[in-house]
Amino acid sequence: MSKRLAALFAMLFAVLVCLQTPALADGLPVAMIDVANTANGYYKADGSEGTSSDYCYKIEDARILLSKTDVVYELTGLTNKSVTIINSSKPTDAFNIRLNGATLSDGINIQNSGYFTRVSVETAAGSSNTVNKLIARDLTISGAGSVNAQYVGSSGGADAKLHITDAKVTVNVPTNSNEFNGACVIDGSAEVRFIATKDYAPLQVENGGSLTLKDGAKLYCLHDNPNLASGSYVAGLEMFSAKLRLEGNSYLEAEARPCTNPDYNGDAIVSYGGVDVLDNAKVVARANGAGLNVGALTVSGEGARIDAESKAASGVAADSVTVENGGTIDASGSWQAIYSRGDFKAGAGAFVNLESGGCALWAEGNLAADGALIQAVPNKDVALFSKGDVDIKKSTIIARAESGDEAIRARGDITANLSWLDLKSTSGEGVTGTITNSVVFNNNVGTVIGDAVTNVNNFIDRNASLTIPEGASLIVGDGLDLRNDGVVNVLGTFNVGNGTLTCLNHSGGLATCAAGPLCDLCQTEYGVPDPTNHAHLEHVEAKAATTEAEGNIEYWACSGCSKYFADAAAREEIEQASTVLAKLPEQKPAGNNSGNGGGNDNGGDKKPQQAANKKGTKSQLPATGDALNAALPLAAALAGVIVIASGFVVSKR
């Protein structure tokens, strides 16, 4: 009796567990099915025996039939039987399946597949599952587990839907391409891989459909042997007229196969409905054909990026190309890196980096850059070409035409304003057009035209020189850095403004006897002083000495080195003391002490000369050998003699 009670309690506990197992979003009850160990028959959701009129699922020799939309079928174990959904004619009702370590060798199939059937498949957290195929008119795959399959898709026409969120899905495509129909969305943290093993694209999105990647979702369209040449055209992601859109931090990677006939090399991504890469999304495409062969292409967002590589065609071929708001295209091709069948536009913050065998960027329409940075390096041909006009504003263009062609060429007009053009052309002319308020380098020799302002963090190469002519000016843009490792000759005006200057190589200026030269660009002293260059030489005129003040000879004094020179060329250095003329001594009055003007009416019997030369009287001549200074006392004495003689004659009369 106790054994029977224990068994009964165990059965009741199992039923309660089944009824209380967490379910999908609607909180539905869960029907636990071990697909490997269930006998044939009708079963209710709790696993008890049912009938043909009230069963939840039915086990047959070749099938496991699921008939209810108001439960969650949680499948575990391995089976070769087909898990078949008995289709509901109510498209609003979804069949809910949770995979929890299940291996379904024949996949999940739809009975009466012509109806619009909604199927929601959840992968239990941490579980690994294998399902041969998952297909429905409206299919959702979710959860924190993984599923391996040979086919996953939405069936039907444009009204079909596919949504993969969070789950990890790997599809090894054994034959024809896997196919999406209608609106297809991959989002959350989903990681989806399609790997082709035959000569077909891993994934196709049919006409009238669309594919959108959001959040942090990742999609890979790969081949198990991508370098093996096929006998026909084999793409990576083939979308025909369907539109491709990437948002958030989503990621797409696609590759194509080469062909034994190079004219039919596969393209990595084909979407004539257009491609939008937005926000922080990224696309990586590689092929022998085009990396991307698409309709209108837009790359917009600070982290939005396309990396496209073609070994035998164009990296990007598009009906039109727009890169803006910080978007990036990094493309390479053996033909063009970018071939636009219409216009090409690079807007604010755009970065375009191109390497190619032929022309790096070819636009059948107009080519415009406004606030962009474009680097273009072709092995031959021009760097940038437009059949229309080229209009460059507030942009930096680094273009290298290595084969003798112009760096920039157009059949229409070429204009550039407030831009930085770093061009190289062995033909001698980097660009011919109307250039205003810009910096233009041609083969590393640059000049500033008008009033230029930098628009990105520009760099002057070690082998380059830049001249700012008189009347021209260069200002570093707000928040930007100008990095100089070349030679800059400032004849006009340079201003750091609200930017910064990193000067790695100083040039210009003149060294003086007191200091090394000042860099033309940053005004930093560098090098060593020049002892022969007395830039601060002051001329001092000669001044005669007087009894009141000293005089000086003519000389030149340098305030830079505090030296004195006898000539204007500063070749003959002299001592400062030798420039000084001594002050003259004071002169005593001539005659006796009575103050008589020299007359001898008082009977004076001595001549003035005798008095002056009286023994013991010191000479009044200066000690120096200056002839002028020595003659002054003699002239005074002679004048005295004349006066006395005149007085004597008068008295005789």
Report each predicted region and the residues it spans.
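Bacterial N-terminal signal peptides that target proteins for export
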Residues: M1-F9
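Bacterial N-terminal signal peptides
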Residues: F9-Q20
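Sec-dependent signal peptide cleavage junction
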Residues: C18-L28, P622-A630, V650
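A composition-driven surface/loop motif
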Residues: D26-N505, L521
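Cellulosome-associated attachment modules in secreted, modular CAZymes
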Residues: V476, L628, L634-A639
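Extracellular modular ligand-binding repeats in secreted and cell-surface proteins
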Residues: C503-G591
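C-terminal low-complexity, Ser/Thr- and acidic/Pro-rich disordered "stalk" regions positioned immediately N-terminal
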Residues: A582-A627
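C-terminal membrane-anchoring or membrane-association module
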Residues: A635-R653
